[in-house]
UniProtKB/Swiss-Prot annotation:
This is Thiazole synthase. The active site is at K96 (schiff-base intermediate with dxp). GO terms for cellular component: cytoplasm. It is an enzyme of class 2 (transferase). Belongs to the ThiG family. Keywords: Cytoplasm, Schiff base, Thiamine biosynthesis, Transferase. Its EC number is 2.8.1.10. SUPFAM superfamilies: ThiG-like. Pathway: Cofactor biosynthesis; thiamine diphosphate biosynthesis. It catalyses: [ThiS sulfur-carrier protein]-C-terminal-Gly-aminoethanethioate + 2-iminoacetate + 1-deoxy-D-xylulose 5-phosphate = [ThiS sulfur-carrier protein]-C-terminal Gly-Gly + 2-[(2R,5Z)-2-carboxy-4-methylthiazol-5(2H)-ylidene]ethyl phosphate + 2 H2O + H(+).
Length: 260
């Protein structure tokens, strides 16, 4: 089980609901991923029309917990306003907070992120902030009241995997009591397993599954990878070595030397 504020969740894989080839494939992929938390963009939901109604109906059928996000917001004011609208629409105090600074990298505006988190937490929100792997930013978010931190592995949709392993490991070491979720930049199941092997509590994925040739099969692959990585972490990984170490003990004289 992993703790998200006052809730215990079984699945350590969170999944996004955008970019799938069709609504039916989205639903099948989410179901096969085993995810219990699904992120939803407020802007997509409020687009209206039959397509929006169909989308929301499919999400409800899955019986998952919806985590609305402020994707696309580029200012504190815009993010706070979007979060408040999401709370009314989805009847939840959870919000995945995104404040974007740069259009090319979609890097978070960490200054605006902290400010928006402070405002929302004072207003009763439980904030899931999308941030960089910078420890100082994470500490400020924790000081603001965030109990979940979601650092990126690499830019959104880049599929590059973990680009700053040492920084992510430092976050885990320094924030042992905070729920840490790697969010953005993972492109392969092996990337998810690596994040879990670092001791992260969960990963959030969207593009890597939605844009796969077979999104449903890829959802299953990521599900297994997350479970394998978590089990490996719990089992205790051996440390890397600079030199070889024989796996077979060499004791005494080789048996063939004793043959006359």
């Amino acid at each position: 089980m992993v703790k998200f504020y006052d809730r215990d969740i079984s699945s350590r894989l969170l999944i996004g609901s955008a970019l799938y080839p069709s609504p039916a494939i989205m639903q099948d992929a989410i179901r096969d991923s085993g995810a219990e938390i699904v992120t939803v963009s407020l802007r997509r939901e409020t687009a209206g029309g039959k397509a929006g109604d169909q989308f929301w109906s499919l999400i409800r059928e899955l019986g998952v917990t919806v985590l609305p996000n402020t994707a696309g917001c580029r200012s504190v004011r815009e993010a706070v306003t979007t979060a408040k609208l999401a709370r009314e629409l989805f009847a939840t105090s959870w919000i995945k907070l995104e404040v974007i600074a740069d259009n090319d990298t979609l890097q978070p505006d960490v200054v605006g992120l902290v400010e928006a988190a402070q405002i929302l937490i004072k207003d009763g929100f439980e904030v899931f902030p999308y941030c960089t792997e910078d420890l100082s930013v994470a500490l400020r978010l924790v000081d603001a009241g965030c109990r979940v931190i979601m650092p990126w592995a690499a830019p959104i949709g880049s599929a590059r995997g973990i680009t700053n392993r040492d920084a992510l490991k430092l976050l885990r070491d320094r924030l042992p009591d905070i729920t840490l979720v790697v969010d953005a930049g993972l492109g392969a199941p092996s990337h998810a397993a690596e994040a879990m092997e670092l001791g992260y509590d969960a990963v959030l994925l969207n593009t890597a599954i939605a844009k796969a040739e077979d999104p449903v099969a890829m959802a299953r692959a990521f599900r297994l990878a997350v479970d394998a990585g978590r089990l490996g972490y719990q089992a205790g990984l051996m440390g890397a070595r600079d030199f070889a170490s024989p796996s077979t003990p060499v004791i005494g004289t080789p048996f063939w030397h004793a043959v006359s």
